[in-house]
């Protein structure tokens, strides 16, 4: 179902390693329905990780296809996700969603039909749905929540010595994405547009963002693939070795970790922009664009850091904040110039960080090839 083009699933490309993709997947079930045999088109070191990813979870066909709104008036699939828009749908996990107040809360109840139900200890799980860091933190302090994974940025320093505050590594990258179809690049050659993006990158003081916003030991990203990613052969992917050495060997990346204002100016000049003797962008060739982010104190703080960095040479960047759903929809639709983004690995293989950049990927927010 997820591989079916009619479903238009964001993660449909995850099935492309299965023989017969996308029209006739070579997957068969045993007579007792308890075993699946999957034939791969090529060796895949991370396939078992894929099998544990939500896109590969089993769903009940009757539940999906009988949902109100699933089919349009002409009989074609209108909304493939209609079956899971409200609480009470059939699922196969340890818990079932029994109550859902949209944008407010969710309640999950132990599923007695789960295959390992006897080892599921908690009867209910209650979730608070909010994008407000301050409200989430207040709910934790008042005892309404037992666990949270976000706190207001201005609370981080005071929490570093708190035994309840845990810093956990993530295999992921926080980044800024450019809409390649944006008017920002109108009239520019492919090379000039690339020079503009590289120039903006050289102006951003990543270490300052880590020290003042992140505050928990994040590392500068000099490549999109993060440190610690497996190479599929028992080693680490991001390394200098006999097969490949990064252009900036010391930073293990494609550019250095330091701000390079002079280099940025030279790149912008090559893209057709003029500068005065003081190194400020000429009024004759202005650069002005909008930065899209969701309403979260940390994301907004990072946007403000970038805004200040670019302003140092006269680039005008305005910040547009919006709620989570609007933010996701606008970014996916390409209704932005530059947007904050982030990707935490779904499984430990570099391909997970790379497949999202293809034209037909559901996560192609930068609009490559569109």
Language-model features, listed with the residues they occupy:
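Aromatic- and charge-enriched surface segment that lines or borders ligand/interaction sites
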Residues: 1-7, 37, 136-139, 190-192, ...
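Surface-exposed binding/hinge segments that line
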Residues: 2-71
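Extracytoplasmic/peripheral linker and loop segments enriched in polar/acidic and small residues
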Residues: 20, 27-29, 198, 210, ...
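Gly/Pro-rich hinge or "lid" segments in bacterial periplasmic/extracellular proteins
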Residues: 22, 44, 52-120, 124, ...
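Short, well-ordered beta-strand elements
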Residues: 36-38, 93-96, 106-107, 123-128, ...
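Ligand-site clamp/hinge motif
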Residues: 100, 111-158, 316-318
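A bilobed periplasmic-binding-protein/Venus flytrap-type ligand-binding module shared by bacterial periplasmic
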Residues: 109-113, 171-199, 212
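Append "and occasionally in soluble cytosolic enzymes with long acidic Gly/Pro-rich linkers
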Residues: 192-308
